[in-house]
Curated annotation (Swiss-Prot):
Enzyme Commission number: 1.2.5.1
Induction: Activity is maximal in late exponential and early stationary phase (at protein level). Expression increases at pH 6.0. Under control of rpoS (at protein level). Transcribed at lower levels during anaerobic growth.
Main subcellular location: membrane
Domains as described in the record: Has 4 domains; the Pyr domain which binds the pyrimidine moiety of the thiamine pyrophosphate cofactor, the FAD-binding domain, the PP-binding domain which binds the pyrophosphate portion of thiamine pyrophosphate and the C-terminal membrane binding region, which includes the in vitro-derived alpha-peptide (residues 550-572). The C-terminus is held closely against the rest of the protein and covers the active site; during activation it detaches from the rest of the protein and folds into an amphipathic helix upon membrane binding.
Catalytic activity: a ubiquinone + pyruvate + H2O = a ubiquinol + acetate + CO2
Residues engaged in binding thiamine diphosphate: 50, 382, 406-408, 433-435, 460-466
Outcome of gene disruption: Not essential it can be deleted.
Organism: Escherichia coli (strain K12)
Binding, FAD: 210, 234-235, 251-254, 274-278, 292, 297, 311-312, 403-404
Subcellular location: Cell inner membrane
Protein's recorded name: Pyruvate dehydrogenase [ubiquinone]
Length: 572
């Protein structure tokens, strides 16, 4: 019996080290499903929704650094992959999506479930190609895999179900050679120019992102040599924050006042491996130097006075011998003092209260009780705020989220991918009640896959971050209310340990119990509804917006909201 196209794909993926494929099966994927069953070396991870499959594959790729795979059946099946694939692509992780298609003879006829996948996936992939004949598959699959790995993003192979069942070309090899990522270092002449510029610069600040992964030692040495405070972006937190005497916190909408003021007061700002997008948080008068492995990132969000293309570790390693050590610490010491004040202010907000459970306190205790090498995932919205401000990184912990794409409902799906990839490590999903309930169907996948993830729901019965933005704009928070749900009872009904927490005095015991259980657990914590995530700088328009919101709330007979807002944030 001749090898089918589907079998060729399965064996090629096996040779590339792929261990699992995430997806929802369907008739257009029958060829692939059958080949995987016969082969027995790649596990099919059956989710309830394809979006979850894409998020899970993205988390796997982010943790392993290797190619991860997801699949969707024709039409609606692979359409459901798109949001998760956008997140993978914008996170720069290598993911291959197999998008099954309708019978090849029916393409263009308006057939049942027909879509145009090549157009639909174009914006969330480096490569998207239709396999219309078996002869194409060796080249198309190899190119797709190579582009996903080397370009760090998504590739999509569109495969009609009938083509998958046809014989593969004779003599097609399934050998996969893993090409290593190139190490890019700027020319020495460019490095000397940068060293000279830094020599005559004062009040230097560093802004660091996820491109600093693996460069912690070089980064700290560089900052120490030029006496520069280090500000980090959210995606840089896990790589930069720990064991760092020069760290002064984050900047941005959910950052620290110390990080914000350090950047704004800098005369020279060095951007290292970051695509920080918020123009309002860049200084207007400073010289800006940018170093990034991706030339397309240069000058994308701010003006740039000097730019070098290179990976951060090798570039700093080559730059360090050329840089003259500075003696003046005034700017650095002021930034560190501001950071200590900002950190104390944030820690003061994370104290237990008899009136309500503050989410800051919950996040702080999660960090305290979690394993030293825990993997955290956090939903977009207020859980990301609390994770950014209160989780302590140590070089072993990881933090995953939808930090570039900003999609709701990412935390639980990413936790599935993380736990499957790292079965011996503790995985903690910090979910909002809005995000968790959006893709709650895959809570059943936790049971089915027997994945011991720990899910903590920040249950405030509101789309918290959206409501806060509406208040800042002066709007009433219509449409943000969520039904008060007991998620612990839902967990128990699904066969998972559920723990309900309604008092701050119960938090520690609940977390300790959850983290000690050898299996999945959901901790449903009722947190303060009107908690504000104060940005590092309050603009006049925001202050006016809050005043207008409070006036409108009182006029509309919703004065109780204003009272609760005051009690939660100012009358503790």
């Amino acid at each position: 019996m001749k090898q089918t196209v589907a079998a060729y794909i399965a064996k090629t993926l096996e040779s590339a080290g792929v261990k699992r494929i995430w997806g929802v099966t369907g008739d257009s994927l029958n060829g692939l499903s059958d080949s995987l069953n016969r082969m027995g070396t790649i596990e099919w991870m059956s989710t309830r929704h394809e979006e979850v499959a894409a998020f899970a594959a993205g988390a796997e790729a982010q943790l392993s650094g290797e190619l991860a795979v997801c699949a969707g059946s024709c039409g609606p099946g692979n359409l459901h992959l798109i949001n998760g694939l956008f997140d993978c692509h914008r996170n720069h992780v290598p993911v291959l999506a197999i998008a099954a298609h309708i019978p090849s003879s029916e393409i263009g006829s308006g057939y049942f479930q027909e879509t145009h996948p090549q157009e639909l996936f174009r914006e969330c992939s480096h490569y998207c190609e239709l396999v219309s004949s078996p002869e194409q598959i060796p080249q198309v699959l190899a190119i797709a895999m190579r582009k996903a790995v080397l370009n760090r993003g998504v590739s999509v192979v569109v495969l009609p179900g009938d083509v998958a069942l046809k014989p593969a070309p004779e003599g097609a090899t399934m050998h996969w050679y893993h090409a290593p990522q190139p190490v890019v270092t700027p020319e020495e002449e460019e490095l000397r120019k940068l060293a000279q510029l830094l020599r005559y610069s004062s009040n230097i600040a560093l802004m660091c992102g996820s491109g600093c992964a693996g460069a912690h030692k070089e980064l700290v040495e560089f900052a120490g040599k030029i006496k520069a405070p280090i500000v980090h972006a959210l995606r840089g937190k896990e790589h930069v924050e720990y064991d760092n005497p020069y760290d002064v916190g984050m900047t941005g909408l959910i950052g620290f006042s110390s990080g914000f003021h350090t950047m704004m007061n800098a005369d020279t700002l060095v951007l290292l491996g970051t695509q920080f997008p918020y123009r309002a948080f860049y200084p207007t008068d400073a010289k800006i130097i940018q170093i990034d492995i991706n030339p397309a990132s240069i000058g994308a969000h701010s003006k740039v006075d000097m730019a070098l293309v290179g990976d951060i570790k090798s570039t700093l390693r080559a730059l360090l011998p050329l840089v003259e050590e500075k003696a003046d610490r005034k700017f650095l010491d002021k930034a560190l003092e501001d950071y200590r004040d900002a950190r104390k202010g944030l820690d003061d907000l994370a104290k237990p209260s008899e009136k309500a459970i503050h989410p800051q306190y919950l996040a702080q205790q999660i960090s305290h009780f979690a394993a030293d090498d825990a993997i955290f995932t956090c939903d977009v919205g207020t859980p990301t705020v609390w994770a950014a401000r209160y989780l302590k990184m140590n070089g072993k912990r990881r933090l995953l989220g939808s930090f570039n794409h900003g999609s709701m409902a990412n935390a639980m799906p990413q936790a599935l991918g993380a736990q499957a990839t790292e079965p011996e490590r503790q995985v903690v999903a910090m979910c909002g009640d809005g995000g968790f309930s959006m893709l709650m169907g895959d809570f059943l996948s936790v049971v089915q896959m027997k994945l011991p993830v720990k899910i903590v729901v920040f249950n405030n019965s509101v789309l918290g971050f959206v409501a806060m933005e509406m208040k800042a704009g002066g709007y009433l928070t219509d449409g943000t209310e969520l039904h008060d749900t007991n998620f612990a009872r839902i967990a128990e009904a699904c066969g998972i340990t559920g723990i309900r927490v309604e008092k701050a005095s119960e938090v520690d015991e609940a977390l300790q119990r959850a983290f000690s259980i050898d299996g999945p657990v959901l901790v449903d914590v009722v947190v303060a509804k009107e908690e504000l995530a104060i940005p590092p700088q309050i603009k006049l328009e925001q202050a006016k917006g809050f005043s207008l919101y409070m006036l409108r709330a009182i006029i509309s007979g919703r004065g109780d909201e204003v009272i609760e807002l005051a009690k939660t944030n100012w009358l503790r």
